[in-house]
């Protein structure tokens, strides 16, 4: 008998068994997750958890549904106090706030650069969660934007779907004036106290409130300047119906008061909430600014998942996110069909769900349109003070509407912002 060979086989078998035992033990914990919105983020995370536990039955999940503000407050408090045992293993963070957490609390989130293949995700999503060469989040839903419009109103005003292709903002305003004159409907709703439209236009021009080094990018920001001027024209030329707050804007949309809405893909469910409007809507790319480098793609909103560095289940949490959010293409088909969630994993765009015509939109493949625009969204530096800049912009915008030169308004925005963020 060859005892040497037998010994080698025995050792090999023992090592294999030990490896399997360690692997099994590594995935037998409870992963706690904080997020908001029971009908969207929470429901989607529950679906992801079910898929993972089907292959890893020893793993359990505790998915906690908080209001968005409560998630942010509890996360801020836990990180600031150093009481990491009060924090979850995974937390959902809105993309606009990602850098604020990463820069304010260095070392608090797990670096995932070597754990997940980020080349498969939309670049603009990866960039916003990257700090000093390390990627700290797993991209989730996109806020890629589109222009939804009422085909019946446009037809009454003498416009065809081809007139809504390759729009500029100048042309959009011209069409809006015709629609108002001939149908009595404003082209869109606009809450001048909300910075959303300004941000959409600014990012479509490839710029943000901040430079790459985090310094303010206001007075020399061509995209912001053009966005402010464009929104002022929309107000002064009465193309928009004035609204106050998101609920008021939704009422203007669903009641049929306005002819279009320009928002992130997440508004699709609201647009489709009125069955009697089926077949009366269409989708097109957003208008372009008249500046060098402008695109017809942008983003509004969106969130991503982050693993806490101090998590006792860190490796398990990372493996879960990698297996489901970075690899499971069928998962993305299901959450698109059931929740209207357009994910950031590019490979998922070729699935059947994305290519299905939607009768509500006259048979358009709306999800495929959003998937195509997703890769065109310019990557920008959201910085850590987007909310403060929004406040400065909306506070100074009325002066522009009343005739103050745009360069003076930009200087006032910069001065106010500089005081707020010091």
Swiss-Prot record:
Pfam families registered for this protein in UniProt: SBP_bac_8
Signal peptide range: 1-28
Keywords noted in UniProt: Periplasm, Signal, Sugar transport, Transport
Main location: periplasm
Highest taxon of the lineage: Bacteria
Residue ranges crossing the lipid bilayer per the database entry: none
GO cellular component, one term: periplasmic space
Keyword Signal: yes
Role according to the record: Part of the binding-protein-dependent transport system for lactose.
Family of this protein: Belongs to the bacterial solute-binding protein 1 family.
Protein name per its UniProtKB record: Lactose-binding protein
Organism taxonomic ancestry: Bacteria, Pseudomonadati, Pseudomonadota, Alphaproteobacteria, Hyphomicrobiales
């Amino acid at each position: 008998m060859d005892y040497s060979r037998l010994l080698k086989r025995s050792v090999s078998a023992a090592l294999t068994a030990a490896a399997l035992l360690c692997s099994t033990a590594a995935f037998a914990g409870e992963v706690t997750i904080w997020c908001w919105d029971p009908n969207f983020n929470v429901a989607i995370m529950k679906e992801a958890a079910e898929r993972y536990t089907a292959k890893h039955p020893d793993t359990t999940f505790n998915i906690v549904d908080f209001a968005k503000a409560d998630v942010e407050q509890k996360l801020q408090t836990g990180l600031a106090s150093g009481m990491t045992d009060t924090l979850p293993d995974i937390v959902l963070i809105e993309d606009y706030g990602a850098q604020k957490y990463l820069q304010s609390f260095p070392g608090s989130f797990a670096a995932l650069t070597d754990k997940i293949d980020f080349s498969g995700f939309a670049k603009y999503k990866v960039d916003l969660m990257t700090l000093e060469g390390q990627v700290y989040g797993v991209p989730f839903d996109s806020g890629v934007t589109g222009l939804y419009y009422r085909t019946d109103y446009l037809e009454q005003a003498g416009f065809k779907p081809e007139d809504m292709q390759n729009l500029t903002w100048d042309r959009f305003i011209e069409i809006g004036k015709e629609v108002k004159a001939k149908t009595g409907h404003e082209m869109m709703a606009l809450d001048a106290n909300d910075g959303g439209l300004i941000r959409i236009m600014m990012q479509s021009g490839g710029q943000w409130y901040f430079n790459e080094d985090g310094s303010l990018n206001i007075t020399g920001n061509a995209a912001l300047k053009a966005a402010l001027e464009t929104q002022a024209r929309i107000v002064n030329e009465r193309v928009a119906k004035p609204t106050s707050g998101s609920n008021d804007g939704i009422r203007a949309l669903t009641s049929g008061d306005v002819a279009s809405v320009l928002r992130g893909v997440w508004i699709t469910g609201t647009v489709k909430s009125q069955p009697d409007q089926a077949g009366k809507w269409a989708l097109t790319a957003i208008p372009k600014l008249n500046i060098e480098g402008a695109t017809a793609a942008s983003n509004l909103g969106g969130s991503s998942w982050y693993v806490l560095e101090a998590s006792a289940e860190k490796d398990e949490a990372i493996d879960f996110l990698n297996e489901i959010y970075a690899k499971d293409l069928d998962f993305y088909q299901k959450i698109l069909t059931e929740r209207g969630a357009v994910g950031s994993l590019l490979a998922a765009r070729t699935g059947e769900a994305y290519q299905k015509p939607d009768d509500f939109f006259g048979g358009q493949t709306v999800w495929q349109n959003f998937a195509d625009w997703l890769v065109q969204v310019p990557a920008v530096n959201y910085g850590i003070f987007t909310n403060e800049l929004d406040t400065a912009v909306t506070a100074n915008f009325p002066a522009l509407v009343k005739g103050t030169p745009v360069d003076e308004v930009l200087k006032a925005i910069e001065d106010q912002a500089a005081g707020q963020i010091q």
